[in-house]
């Protein structure tokens, strides 16, 4: 691969990561009104089945290389990223605000980078550590309101814990997807993952918990948007980015989804954004900018 081609490929990777962040950032705002009307498990299953159908035209010509390793990987990816993570996320969202949920998505950055450094021997240069520290500092600001004297573990409600744990499983999904993306087309991974996860969730919701299929006609359009834009398109672009740039870079850029989520919650749900949230957003944006400007200092081993 020539230098120019490699540079263009990396630029595409950054562009795809930004698109994924914008699209996924809209999820909490779109989903918040729905989780009070549609059972979270049923909603998750519908979204992922829609996502699978959306990705089918892009993936139907792509082959899935048959091997025990690939089957185990896609199963693990599906269970972590399309069953456990969305279930916990939407259940937690039923009692959390859309803006809080958007901010907690930065937890995916922590877990994805931590797992990448622990198991895939990725390393950060000086600028990388500074950038990651800025992103982490932004999350600390929005979760504590800079009120450390009164902050206790008791203030972390169960819905917030569910959201945080969901980020752990999406972090596992991110790193496993990166492995499989080296051999399988990203559209095929996203399609199979969504189909398996959606089918499992549908079975659990309808046959396991007896959730009735009573979705109103007016609820279908936002569910379609969630499945097509919030998950199918964002997942596809995210995996495309993983294939072109490493997990650390992709996830740090993807952390901007929380900022887009904050803005969307403020505009469409009239949720108030405080000064410390604005401060945190600025810090995280600068961290991501620094990561891009000092890209050569990121040294995956």
Where are these regions (language model features)?
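Specific transmembrane alpha-helical segments of multi-pass solute transporters/efflux pumps
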Residues: 23-28, 56-105, 141, 227-245
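Membrane-interface helix-cap regions at the ends of transmembrane helices
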Residues: 2-4, 22, 26-33, 37, ...
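Cytoplasmic-side transmembrane-helix entry/capping segments in multi-pass membrane proteins
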Residues: 69-77, 124-136, 184-193, 246
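Helix-helix packing/entry segments at the starts of transmembrane helices
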Residues: 19-21, 44-46, 86, 100-107, ...
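Specific alpha-helical transmembrane segments that line the substrate/conduction pathway
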Residues: 42-53, 90-123, 127-128, 166, ...
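Glycine-/small-residue-enriched transmembrane alpha-helix faces in small-molecule transporters
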Residues: 1-42, 47, 152-179, 301
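Transmembrane alpha-helices of multi-pass small-molecule transport proteins
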Residues: 36-84, 111, 169-173, 190-209, ...
